[in-house]
Amino acid sequence: MAYSAEDIAEHPNFVEALRDFAASLRQQFDDSPRLSRMLASHQRWLLSQAAFALQLEYDPSQPGSGLTTTNLREIITSNNAASRNTVLNFLDQLLSYKFVRIVGDPTRRPKRYEATEVTYQAVYLWLLANLLVLDRLDGGDRVATLRGRPELLRLVQPQIARRACLEPRWLEPPPRVALFLWTEAGGLVMDELVRRAVEPVPGGEAYEIGRIDARQLAEQFMISRTHLQRLFRRAVDAGCLSWPDDTRKNCLLNREFLREYCHWQAVKFSIVDRAYEQICGPVRLEKPEPRLGAVREA
């Protein structure tokens, strides 16, 4: 039976698995920064997942199916995730960066788009990374199954996208999480903070995450340093981040803020698990599932 969001959030292995997941996303960014930025805010994540699902769902016997501006707009604007103009600009960006291409006559309306090979590979790696988190919770065989049958991506991903675009808890992050996720490249920043959250301070109220160099991070993530500094100031005001002294050599990530983020991410992983189970059936376990009683502090 697929995990609930509550079971995932309370699992003793989840925080560590999520930290490694954030590190894997950072590696994907380093390998393909421009494409990774298409998933780097919550709005772009929703747009990207919906767009990829639509192009997979294309049916030649159904006129108007597939990834078109109209179809993407219907999904996205129905939950107020983006405006019509944002959808248009997003597709234009995908096309200009060659992450999608126009199928058939480019003068014909409506234009239909399909993902290019680099996009397929990126989504495949993204799904593997998500399934690996779930496998680390129960010793399951999700990753092995997808690697053995990569064509399952075409069936599982649309289920994830459709469910995600209908799940209120995923659509609306908690306020402090939204502070990052609704901003440009905020997902990249959040991944960077989470992957550093290894050492708790005495008392366990925060995690030491080292020095935050806004200039360096802004260059790496291809965003304005002013924008990033403003984001960090708001995060400090909201109690997400703090510095123990005036030297600012060692930033602290608030434990309760990390817990909020973990619970929100658990909603997504539950969606992924339910979608996987619907297509692939129950997961085969390779080792006993850890007891869910004692929750690891996050």
Named regions from a protein language model:
Residues 118-147, 257-287:
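Short, amphipathic alpha-helical interaction segments positioned at domain boundaries
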Residues 1-35, 141-162:
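N-terminal leader segment of winged-helix/HTH proteins
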Residues 81-96, 222-236:
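Short amphipathic alpha-helical interaction segments
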Residues 107-115, 247-255:
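Minor-groove-contacting beta-hairpin "wing" of winged helix-turn-helix DNA-binding domains
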Residues 58-78, 200-220:
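Short acidic, hydrophobic short linear motifs in intrinsically disordered regions
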Residues 138-199, 284-298:
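Exposed, interaction-prone assembly regions rather than primary DNA-binding/catalytic cores
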Residues 24-58, 169-200:
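Short alpha-helical segments that sit at the start of domains
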Residues 95-105, 236-246:
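A short, conserved structural fragment
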